[in-house]
Amino acid sequence: MKKNLTLFAVIAVMFATLLTGCASAPQFETEAESAQRPILIQGPMPIEAEKFAQRLDKVKVEKSGTFVFYIGKLDKYPVIVAKTGKGMENTAAATAVAIEKYDPIAIINQGTSGGHDPSLNVFDIVLGERTTNIGSLKTGHLEENEGIEPTNWIPMDLMASEGSAGEDPNAEKARYYEGDADLLAAANAVKDKYTKGKVVKGTIGSADVWNNEVDRINWFHENYGTSVEEMEGAAAAQIAKAYDVPFLGIRVLSNNKTNGGQYNPNTAEANQDYVYEVVKQYISKIHEK
C-alpha cells in the first residue's frame, strides 16, 4: 500500500510538472513576442494607409488625438500602420507619439508625391536616400514696394543651432536626412518585384506647400536636387533623427507636372504593395540576427 502511495505521488508530481511546462511555454512565447520592437509604417491619408493595414494579422486599433494606429503582425512580427493625417505638423506629432508609445525599431514614411524630376513617371517610386524640408526658407532684404524675389530665397536649417536661425550664417543651407542603410538595402532587394514602374534612389522634398508652378518645381529640383515633393517625410525624418530611430521615406509619383504626368489615385495602393514587400524583407533580416 505504501509503495502504491509513493508511486502515485511521483506520478502526480510528474503530471503537475508537465502541466506547468505546457502552461509556461505559451507565456514564454508571449513574453518573447512582446519584447520585439515594432516596425512603424506611416501613411498620411486613408488612401495611403488603410490598404496596408488591411493586410496585417490580428489587428487592433488604437487612437491618440486624431492619429490612428493599426497594430498587428506581418510574418508573425509586430507592425504598426499609422494614419498620421496630412502635413508636417500632423506627421511630426504622430511620429513623436508613436516613438514614445510603441518604441519602433524602424520607421517608413510612405505615400504619394508629385514629381520634380522630368525623367520620372507616374507609378515610379523614389527611395529617400535623402529627405529635406523645402519649406524652411529665408528671404532676402527688400523694403516696401521693392517686390518679392522667391528665386533669391535661400534654405534655412532650423536645426543648425538652438539660437535664431534667421541670424545664424551656419543655418543658411539645406539639411538632408539620410535614409537608413538597412532599410534601403531591404527596399533595393525587392525592387524587381515592383512591375508598375521603376524604383530609384533620390531626394524627397517636404513642405506644407502645394507647388503647381513648373518653374518653381524646377527651381527646387535644381537647387535642392529633389526628385519628388510631398508634405510629410522631412517632419517624420527630423523626429526619427531626434530619437535615433532608423528612417526611410518611400514615395510613388502620383503625378508629374514637369512632363505632363496626370494624377492617378491608384498609385497609393501600388506603393503600399511595394512597401509591404520591403517590410517582409526587412523582417527576414531581423529574424536572421
Language-model-derived ranges and their functions:
Residues 117-221:
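Mid-sequence, gly/pro-rich, charge-dense loop/helix-turn segments that line enzyme active sites
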Residues 1-9:
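Bacterial N-terminal signal peptides that target proteins for export
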Residues 26-96:
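N-terminal short beta-loop-beta anion/metal-coordinating cradle
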Residues 103-105:
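Proline-aspartate-enriched helix->loop->beta-strand connector
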Residues 19-21:
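C-terminal motif of bacterial Sec signal peptides marking the signal peptidase cleavage site
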Residues 207-249, 258:
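A C-terminal functional module that forms or caps the active site or interfaces directly
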Residues 257-289:
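His/Asp/Glu-rich mid-to-C-terminal helical/loop segments that flank catalytic regions of hydrolases
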